[in-house]
Amino acid sequence: MLPGGLSAGYPEISYHAANILEWDCPQGYDVALCSLVLHHFNDDDAVKLLRRCRELSKRFVLVSDLRRGFLLQAGVYLLTELIFREPMTRFDARLSAQRAFSFGEMRELATRAGWKDFDHKKFRFARQAIWLE
């Protein structure tokens, strides 16, 4: 679903797409949400992204991403071998499983970004989230 679909009746909700590492934002936002993109950044840029999310948010930051481990890599391999066999999907899914951060690495990135008193939790299906209130 495209941004704005379910929130079309709420003019106080807005969306903005930009390169977060270069964007000169004139204002802060209530919520900074980063979903399933952190693993596309190298460690240093991931730290910059987390720092930037904290700077942009007035209230809450939520970062949800893949959690690297054997189950993720085995599951992705099987799914892309048996079901999702398109070459681009196969390549991207397997690369994402390799590049995902482990639970400890995600915590370390948040610490390097200067996050204090943040929460971090594992979820099913090789997911994890960190958040800052």
Identify the role of each PLM range.
Residues 33-34:
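A conserved beta-strand element that flanks and buttresses the S-adenosyl-L-methionine
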Residues 124-133:
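C-terminal lobe and adjacent flexible extensions of AdoMet/dcAdoMet transferase-like proteins
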Residues 50-68:
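Conserved beta-strand signature within the Rossmann-like core of class I S-adenosyl-L-methionine
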Residues 66-115, 119:
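C-terminal alpha-helical "lid/dimerization" subdomain adjacent to the S-adenosyl-L-methionine
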Residues 22-27, 43:
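Short conserved loop adjoining the S-adenosyl-L-methionine
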Residues 1-23:
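Class I SAM-dependent methyltransferase SAM/SAH-binding core
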Residues 37:
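Hydrophobic adenine-recognition pocket in adenosine-nucleotide-binding enzymes
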